[in-house]
Amino acid sequence: MNDITNQLEWISRLVAFDTTSSVSNLALIEDIESYLSEQKVETFRVENDDGTKANLYALVGPKVPGGVVLSGHTDVVPVAGQDWATAPFTVIEKDDRLYGRGVADMKTFSAIGLSLVPEMLSANLKRPIIFALSYDEEIGCLGAPSMIAEIADKLPKPDAVIVGEPTNPAPRQPIS
């Protein structure tokens, strides 16, 4: 059964990869491919022109129309020139918050989804869950178009897409 410990391990696992937009994301992609392969989930890789970066998508459940895409990106913004009190690619928990490059934007969304794959597989899904992880979102969504085209060509059309990208993550103000 999935629990918060497993999810925290997945968050730490993904944050540990330096996937700054200026470097390759292939080590992270290979790690996720390996995990999904162990779970008997087929993965599809869409590389950039020079083969240094890749999108990854995978279908969990039946290959039928409908279902939902869980969409995220693997790259993070640079840490250079920032005053980090801790190692940016190591998750630190302090005051019930997690700190590390990519925790908010946006490796946590992908980590939680990936941590739930065993439950998804045992749920006897009637419609698929599709993971779609792109590269270079931080510098113009460069990877997403080729992956979207591949998914449209190779998989049944989903009913919905959930994009785990945080928007305006400022603390919420109470409604009075």
Q: At which residue positions do the language-model features occur?
A:
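Short alpha-helical scaffold segments that flank and stabilize functional sites
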Residues: 10, 61, 116, 146-147
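Fold-level recognition of mixed alpha/beta catalytic cores in primary-metabolism enzymes, strongest
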Residues: 95-98, 108-115, 121-176
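Acidic/His- and Gly-rich active-site-bordering loop/insert found
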Residues: 1-103, 122-125
